[in-house]
């Protein structure tokens, strides 16, 4: 009976492990799983049943593994013990164990081993054709530099050797060219100086001939301007005098009435006529001959229009 109970327990454990691995949402088993069911008539022989693993991540081995069945009909237990149910959050153990952590500086092992021709700096290995191209390019660049340097050195040496015998000829050619240039420069300079002198002489002659009429014209213009200035000054003075008189008349008219002024003028005229008549009578008494009014008016220089005197009739009008 004990053997049958152990077989049932192992089969249940296998079923529970399969269900836990297939369904992640299955409830986690408790730390102390229930004891396997036994028949009511069969007494339990094993006092210490095998305890399940406590941690979900690390499986614990049993201290007392169950004894294998002796009967030929009983199924034999598996070599690997059933894995305990794990939580969905806990990482399941992988078939291949994880590689140990390596330092960042340590080179990781590669699937393809590095070839012996690869560089120590960690560059990818190149195939045969690129390597040959690089070698050719390097050799060509080195050879080009060396050729250029040799050419420079050879050119410098050739220039030094050629410059020594040809220096005198070059100096002679330069001196001849400078002399020819000086001669060419001096010839047009002389021609230009002669042309300048002739132009200056012609301009002086024409300038002297043109200066005389210009001076006479300027003198005439100055005289005309002076006369015009005098005429304008006189006109300005006359206008100012007329303006002054008009201002006086305006002032008198504003202060006095015109009718009053006319009456005053009439009174003054009558007084003047009376005075002339009295003088005529007095002077005629002193002298034997009688003096006329025209003689008195001419003697005193009085205007006939002011006194309203008529010379033809020798009488005052408007008396």
Swiss-Prot record:
Major location (coarse): nucleus
Ranges of biased composition (kind: Polar residues): 117-127
Coiled coil: 220-270
Pro residues composition-biased segments: 26-40, 65-116
Gene Ontology terms for molecular function: transcription coactivator activity
Modified residues (Phosphoserine): 67, 71, 83, 87, 99, 103, 140, 143
InterPro entries named in the record: SFR1, SFR1/Mei5
GO cellular component, one term: nucleus
BP GO terms, sorted: double-strand break repair via homologous recombination; positive regulation of DNA-templated transcription
UniProt-annotated location(s): Nucleus
Region annotation (Disordered) ranges: 1-215
UniProt keywords, alphabetically: Coiled coil, DNA damage, DNA repair, Nucleus, Phosphoprotein, Transcription, Transcription regulation
Function summary: Component of the SWI5-SFR1 complex, a complex required for double-strand break repair via homologous recombination. Acts as a transcriptional modulator for ESR1.
Assembly and interaction partners: Component of the SWI5-SFR1 complex. Interacts with RAD51; the interaction is weak.
UniProt similarity note: Belongs to the SFR1/MEI5 family.
Identification of the protein by name: Swi5-dependent recombination DNA repair protein 1 homolog
Source organism of the structure: Mus musculus
Lineage: Eukaryota, Metazoa, Chordata, Craniata, Vertebrata
